[in-house]
Amino acid sequence: MSDKVKRFLSHPLLSNRRLLLGIWIILSLAGMLKFHRSYNNFLIFKGVYWHTVNGTSLYAAYPTEYRDVNHYGPLFSLIIAPFAILPEWIGMLLWLLFLSGWLFAAIYWSGLRKSQQVYIYWFCGFTLLTALFMQQFNIAIAAIILSSFFLIDKEHEGWAAFFIVLGTLVKLYGIVGLAFFLFSRHKVRLILWLAVWSVILFLAPMAISSPDYIIGQYQEWYSSLVAKNTENIHSIAQNISLLGLVRRTTGCMNYSDLWLILPGMALFALPFLRFSQYKNLAFRETILASVLMFVILFSTGSESSGYIIALTGACIWYTVVPWKRGKWAVALMVFVFILSGMGNSDLIPKWIRHDYIQQYALRALPISILWLWLCYELCTKDYTPIEKVDADE
């Protein structure tokens, strides 16, 4: 990152993790402002537990309970269980604290230097609040992907496999953790643990239901995701991605997203051919940043709250490289913060927010530019450390 940003964030007050934790707790409390107006997502999540216990469909509509339908896997019933059995306001408050705490801890226990962690805490705070207002699990997905990477990097394949499988069986996004497989020093061990955790976590919801019910719900989940993907393509609230950006700005609807997804996957995979760079932590961390952005840019299910994932990736891209970022990188991060981070905020005039940002999925634009820049760097730059970095930074 630039020297000015580093000096600013190194101030004892701004870099105090206890203060930052306090701010994130306050943001969680602020998320409760939606309790008396719109906490529909929490009601859906709560319903996942109770419908599992009662043996009713997890993917049917229950208009007397909540709007919309659930799209999370049966395993989610166990994650939400401690919060679902409490009175609604207590359950929702603890849920928001749980989500914020999980991501805060994942960043804290990562391999990122303190200065990099502090940058993420500050930069992503506003986007975190947006996700908290929606009570969304995307906050935890960011934590799961981070944990998958750094646990593999620290040779804790067993726990890395746990988080990869957990994220996959809850919201599919976790499967991107498999992208870090090539960085593992114990690939056979990782494969074995993936198999073990897949069996354990697949069976786990049966503890509060039955085998036939859970197997049936996984089948329903697949069908619901296929149907949801079709709906997302034309939804204003969904597909806030590179796919949606291209579709809405061009006005062309009669083509397959594979025309964008396949080149995107090729560009994403190309840096993995640079085997000589694997030894450089900055290279591997930039791959992590690419994964965090790719999962949002190339998913029709990308929604406003998902940008906590992409912005975490943007912060990692900006801070981990061994060279100093220039003015263009700083300008791009400002663009990311304003449009991708605040694009859904009431601080943006309503007519701009609704008629342009939302209508054309413009929140994806800065992240798309940044990701393309990132891919270019991954394919051309040398990530060998050029200076010794203080371990306390």
Regions found by a protein language model. Name each.
Residues Y318-E393:
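Aromatic-enriched
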Residues E303-Y318, A364-P366:
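Hydrophobic/aromatic-rich transmembrane helices and adjacent perimembrane loops
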Residues S2-W159, S184-S304, T384-V389:
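Primarily membrane-embedded glycan-assembly and transfer machineries that use lipid-linked glycans
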Residues I164-L182, S299-I309:
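Transmembrane helices and adjacent periplasmic/lumenal helix-loop junctions
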Residues L169-L172, I200-A204, L339:
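Membrane-embedded alpha-helical segments of transport systems
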Residues I141-A142, A161, D212-Q219, S304-T312, ...:
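A cytosolic-side transmembrane-helix exit/cap motif
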Residues F104-Y108, I145-K154, V176, F180-S184, ...:
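Hydrophobic transmembrane alpha-helices
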